[in-house]
Every structure is written in C-alpha cells, then in structure tokens.
Amino acid sequence: MLREFVPEPAYSTTDEDTVFALLSRRAKRDPDDLIAQWQDDETRRWHDVTAGEMLERVRAVAKGLLGLGVKAGSMVVIYSPTCYEWGVIDFACAAIGAVSVPVYETDSARQAASIIEEVDPIIAFAGDFAHTQTLEQIRDEHSSLRYVFNFKADGLDAVADFGEGVGEDTLDQVISRVKADDMLTIVYTSGSTGKPKGAMLSHRNFTHIVLNGYIILDEMLYQPNRLMLFLPLAHCFARYIQYVAIGGQGVVGYLPGAKHLLADLRSFKPTYLLGVPRVFEKVYNAASQKAGAGIRGRVFAKAFDHFVQWSKDEQETGRHSIVARAEHSFFMSVVGKSIRSALGPNMRYLACGGAPLNVDLAHFFNGMDGITFIQGYGMTETAAPMIVNWQDANRVGSVGKPGPGMGVRTDDDGELQVMGPNVFLGYYKKPELTADVKMADGWLKTGDLGTIDDNGFVYITGRKKDIIITAGGKNVSPAPMEDVINTCPIVSHGVVVGDGKPFIGALIELDQEMVRSWLAQQGLDSNMPMEQIAKNDAVRAFIQQYVEKANANVSRAESVRKFEILDEEFSQEKGTLTASLKVVRPKVLKRYENVIDNVLYAPKPSNKPLPKTVQILDRTTETVKQASESMRQASESVSPKVRQAFDTMQEKIKKQTEDTGESQTPEDSSETEETTMNEER
C-alpha cells in the first residue's frame, strides 16, 4: 500500500440512528419548521410542508403499508421522478423496516421488470399514469407484485386508507424494532461499466455520513438552508442530500427534473445546488453561448481565465495584486453578476459529485464572489459522498478528504480503496460479486485510480477499467482529456478511444440544441440535418480548438490525433447513457465499433511513389500476366500436347510471380516500422 488516510469519527452512530429518526427528531424539535416545498403541475406555485405535517403524513402512510401486509424486510418498489410523495414513501418504508427499491423514471419497461423480478416486491409506487401502466403490465407477469399505486391518482391517500385499523401504539412498536444496521434500501448501480447490480445499504450507511457531514460542513448542510432537489432520488447522491436537509435545518424543494432550471432557481432561491458535472457544464455552456462571438465573446473568455486564476491564487496564497483586484471588479460586473443572478440571490454553495468535473470549470465558479464550489467523491456502494472538501479545508480540483471515521488508501496499482461505517452490505443475491470488491479487512475496491497528498486530499485520475493500452504499449487514462473536450459548448460528451490501436482517437457527441444555436451565431444554416452538421468544417474547427487544449496537457503518445463527430445523441434508450447521464463506455465502443475501426483507424492509401526496383518488378509482373492470358486463349484450340506444355509454362510463370512478388521491399518495411515506433514515442 502506498498511502492511507483515516480521520477519527466526530460522531459515532448508535443503533437508534435510523433514517426515520432524522425526520422524527426534526419534527420533535420544531414541528412548525418549514421542511419541504413542492410545485403544482399547472401553476408551478410552491406549496409549503412543515416538519410536523410531513411526519404526520409519513406515519399515516406507514400504517397503510402495515395494513397492506408490508413488514420489516418487505420490498417496496418506487418507479417515479423526484417528488414530495417519493420522499414520504421513502421515510415511511424506513420507519417500519421495509426495504425501498428505487427504479429510475427513465428506465425502460424491460429494465424495471428485471429489477422487480429480482427483488420480488409486494407493492410498487408509480410517479404517473405511464409508469403505472408499465407496472401493471409487469404485475400480470409477476405474481409477487400485488399492489400498484399512482402518485398522480392520490396513491398516498389510498395507501393511508388501509391503515385505519392500525393503531399508533402498534406503529410505534414496529418503529422501535428497526435498528441502524437493518437494510434500508437496494439501490441499483448505474451500470456505466456493465449490468446494474443491486447494492444493499443499511440505515447506518447513510446516517453515519449525514450526521458526521453536519460537523465538517456545518454552514452548508446543517444551518438553515434551502435545497432545490431535481436529481433523481433513485440516485444515492440525491437520496443522501435529502436526508441531510431533512435531518438538519433545511428546506427541500422537490422537482421532477431540471427542465425549468433557471426559472425554478429564481422562484425557490436555494442556498446551495447539488448537481452532476453535466449540470454545471450546461450552465457554463449557456453563458458562453449567450456571450457569443465578437467583443462579448472575447470578454467572456478573458473573464473565464480571470476567475480560474483568482480561485487558484485565493487557494494558494489568499492574496491578489492591485491589478487583479481591479480586473475582478470589472469581470464580476460584466460576467459574474449575470451568472450569480441566474443562480438566485441566496446561492452560496455549488456541490458537484457523481463523476469528475474539469478542474478549470470548478475554479471558474469558485472564483466568483459569494460562491464556494465543493467537490466530493462516492459511489452507490458507499451511500454516496464519503470523501468531500471540508468547510475549513477546500481544495478545488481535489474531491476532498475522507469524512470522519471513513478511510481511503491506494494499492500498488494506484486504485483507491475505502472503508467506514458507510460501506455497503453487499450486492443483492450476488455474493461472488460482493467478494470481488469487498475485502476481508473491510476495505472496498472502488475501481477508480487516484492519489492522496500529504494532507489527505484525494485526486481522481481515472477509472481502472477505462485505461487504454495502445498498440505501442502506452497506458492512457481517457478522463483528463475528456474533461477538457467536454467544456466545448457544442459538445455533450467526448469519448477517448484507442485500446490496441496505433494512436489515441475520440468520438464526439454533439449537444444538438447548443450546436444549432452556435451555427446561427456564426451566420450558418442552423436547420441543416445532423448528418451535415457532423461533417461541417466550422463545427470541426471549433471542436479542434478544445482537442488541442486537451492535448496540451499530455504527451504526444497520449494526445488525440484524430476525432470523429457523431450525428446522433447518446441516450439511455440506446444504452449509451446511464440514468445519471454517465457514459456507458463498453456500449459506446460496441455501438460505434464500425466508426472506430473503419473511420478513425481506417488504413490510409499510400501516396508515396514506389522505389524503382519495385516499379520494375511491377511492370515485369504485368507483362507476364498479359502473356499468360494470351497463351491461355490460344491453348483452347490446340492439341492436348500443346495444352500440356501450356500448363507447364503456367506453373513456371506462377513460380516466377511468387518469387518476384508485389509486397513491400525490406527497405519499405523498415521505414514503416520506424515511423510507427516514432509516432508511439
């Protein structure tokens, strides 16, 4: 082992620290405290919920679940976008020891059926009528699924009605039997490296990082705050932050997605925003597009460089020159002010997780007045962020340090391993896969590569399974280059390829909305088909600038020599994106195998003239072939003896052709081999 860092726990969880206890303690402290808000579908008006009201609703639904035959250990499926009802069911299941099994709202009927078949639930909740129809079709084929309730058809009221015969004392007895080490949920991994697996997580897995998180990020997580929650609650990251806000002094604004993100930011006025990298890339890309070309575009580019450097200087020395201060005032007034305004007047923290984010983009946001950019690291198997930047120790570019009582170390290959009370129980019905990642000493193999500095800060360098080994034997991590390419406003995803190939290449997926807007700004046809856009010289030249930026950070052997722009978008339906918008690399490589092999790495026809010796042999061979054909035609009308003589001549000609050959001369072969070796070097 190269390095290990394990902080002492600031708070040791007890058996009573369940997820339901986070809500019940909050309601007991102040039942009139505002705890949640949800939007009306038609008017988009926010509706308030107090802590006491939410607790009362959760208890009523919990009694209804008991009335339906749900008990400790029973599986309850939730197939819905993020909404207040999702949160109520989550806490109701936690209260009675039932196991919630979330299904992403974007999962197909086949994917939902696969999960339901594996966990055998007796009850499922749907977010709308379409999800209800899917679940009812699945129910016809799975006898274990008895009940389907639709949130949009007053499903919670219907469930609560089944609890009329369940007394408060009975419910309290059931709640008291639930302990921190009991299973809380089965969360299916996003499947970015293969088939999704069901990770079993306990109450303690979550409550340990929630309660210790209040200590290291008190201002952001525990003090009165407002969280706009639009990430899918099927994702561990969103689930964790919901528990944080409910258990502290936060208000959760439940939203089904980010369709109206800017308008919702203005109306809800959050104090911090939780997002995956794509959210922040889109905010930056929108601002960059709005600036456009010309003077405004150049000012925006200068502002970007300034905010990045300001953040770096603040982090390293905390000092700025008089010139830098004057520039900062100017760039805040012409660029920073509008972005701050779009984020809302109360925004203080931006938190990013779920995947790596380009470090300069993180510095860009962090360099603006009043914004602290926080990065963290976690996975489904660790109940989300177990490594995070602390309030008094934030290093942009790092994912932070392990939280109290949690540890990180690297093995000899540079793979990160983690440990702590937050590490999952195992994969559901897959003990052999659990044994592959969960070691005998309690440490978990993450599959991610990284480094740990002297102060315990962790830096992610790539994904172990994503490492590309070129034909020349060079090991290349695609993540650093992809991070830079993805900052191009018209790019959704760049996927670096080259395993077993002579050089590194890339597939480029365009952001179709942004690229059409960009074309219009350039005075080009924005309505042309995507097939033409993908081949457009201006589009290619613009992306080339970002490829060159990426190449500037790596050696020639690691640089992208060639890229191909795709004319279609990645999607969950195609299998190329997970529900949390991560690229499923194996599926991308398989889907675009023909593009990779026959476009990116198509052998080039040689324009180099053949050496004179080869030209002479070539002409000789052609003359022999012509003579052979003439003799064949003549032989058709001669005697058998002459025909036999012709056949003998044919054999001699064939042997002569093989001896002279049309292949490369030794000189050419050596030259080609030397060129290839030079390119790989």
Listing of model-derived features with the role each one plays in the protein:
Residues 74, 90, 107-137, 209-228, ...:
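Conserved ATP-dependent adenylate/AMP-binding module captured primarily in the ANL superfamily
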Residues 207-337, 346, 368:
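Conserved AMP-binding/adenylation subdomain of ANL enzymes
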